[in-house]
């Protein structure tokens, strides 16, 4: 399969009348990769779909995703929801860049809500400060005795 590098983003269209007034997108920047092996996880075997690969959201794709997400919303409030696998495996700098792109591409005064679903194992003082600074409204985490 031939891959084309996206060096320039295509011009964006205004949202059409058929576009729903608002929607939530779930972003899985690390794909199925996770640092735990919870038996209950429905996503557990998905990493095996691409054996030997390291599928991750590139910085270029992050920039395109953020811009198109912000431009396509018809509501004043935008929601960006990070999931995985384990999204924190992308590293704190990835999320710093995502917030930078949001600030660059959002409309003036446009509120953006962030959530992240994580197992919490990578959350340290730096992560906690970042999440607090950028008002991540939800920090969902969970594991059970079934972790192996």
Which ranges hold each PLM region?
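Flexible, acidic/Gly-rich N-terminal and inter-domain linker regions that tether
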Residues: 1-24, 36-40, 68
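Short, motif-level signal for alpha-helix interfacial/capping segments enriched in acidic residues
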Residues: 12-15, 57-65
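Canonical Radical SAM [4Fe-4S] cluster-binding loop centered on the CxxxCxxC motif
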Residues: 19-60
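Short, charged low-complexity linear motifs
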Residues: 25-28, 62-72
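Conserved, mostly hydrophobic/aromatic
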Residues: 34, 38, 82, 116
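Conserved non-cysteine loop/helix-boundary elements of the Radical SAM core domain that shape
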Residues: 46-61, 85-94, 122, 148
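Radical SAM/AdoMet-radical enzyme domain recognition
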Residues: 66-67, 71-81, 90-148
